[in-house]
Amino acid sequence: MASSLLAGERLVRALGPGGELEPERLPRKLRAELEAALGKKHKGGDSSSGPQRLVSFRLIRDLHQHLRERDSKLYLHELLEGSEIYLPEVVKPPRNPELVARLEKIKIQLANEEYKRITRNVTCQDTRHGGTLSDLGKQVRSLKALVITIFNFIVTVVAAFVCTYLGSQYIFTEMASRVLAALIVASVVGLAELYVMVRAMEGELGEL
């Protein structure tokens, strides 16, 4: 917090011999304090500006009060031309090494927990995707097997019908009898194939 001014050349000259404050008959204590403050040089934060003269706000208030009591024509703002508020450099306290180490440990723990959480979500998603693809593969294979079974069933029934129709020409001379015999044989073969196909499908469903 600011508590002093960087005195400008105007204030320094006013307090010197023959200066503007000489006719104002400053109290001895106030003059001594002002001269001591202006005579003491402080090193500022900026080395290029050189030594700096610091005057506390209390001395400035006392000077202002004295000028008002004397009804002086010399105003304080005129004396403070070129002066600036002095803001001391804030010195940061050293950090506690134990506290710093503890904070770093907490950061590492939080980072590890976050990494585990992210990787756990990714693993779960991969597992779900893998299970879905596996189920889809099983369904495709089952559908393929079903299509092949139906195709084999149709081919077998048609083959039984054709073979019976062609072979029955040596037994029956009429076409109607030959067709009827072929239908009977094809039906029997179809029922047998259908029975085998149903049992096979039941076995596959039991495995699923």
Curated annotation (Swiss-Prot):
It is found in: Cytoplasmic vesicle, COPI-coated vesicle membrane; Endoplasmic reticulum-Golgi intermediate compartment membrane; Endoplasmic reticulum membrane. GO terms for cellular component: COPI-coated vesicle membrane; endomembrane system; endoplasmic reticulum; endoplasmic reticulum membrane; endoplasmic reticulum-Golgi intermediate compartment membrane; lysosome; vacuolar proton-transporting V-type ATPase complex. One of its GO terms (biological process) is cellular response to increased oxygen levels. The keyword Metal-binding does not apply. InterPro entries: ATPase_Vma12. The modification N-acetylalanine is found at residue 2. Its main location: membrane. Keywords: Acetylation, Congenital disorder of glycosylation, Cytoplasmic vesicle, Disease variant, Endoplasmic reticulum, Membrane, Transmembrane, Transmembrane helix. Coiled coil: none annotated. Pfam families: Vma12. It is a multi-pass membrane protein. GO terms for molecular function: oxysterol binding. The chain crosses the membrane at residues 146-166, 179-199. Accessory component of the proton-transporting vacuolar (V)-ATPase protein pump involved in intracellular iron homeostasis. In aerobic conditions, required for intracellular iron homeostasis, thus triggering the activity of Fe(2+) prolyl hydroxylase (PHD) enzymes, and leading to HIF1A hydroxylation and subsequent proteasomal degradation. Necessary for endolysosomal acidification and lysosomal degradation. May be involved in Golgi homeostasis. Binds 20(S)-hydroxycholesterol (20(S)-OHC). Accessory component of the multisubunit proton-transporting vacuolar (V)-ATPase protein pump. It is linked to Congenital disorder of glycosylation 2P: A form of congenital disorder of glycosylation, a genetically heterogeneous group of autosomal recessive, multisystem disorders caused by a defect in glycoprotein biosynthesis and characterized by under-glycosylated serum glycoproteins. Congenital disorders of glycosylation result in a wide variety of clinical features, such as defects in the nervous system development, psychomotor retardation, dysmorphic features, hypotonia, coagulation disorders, and immunodeficiency. This is Vacuolar ATPase assembly protein VMA12.
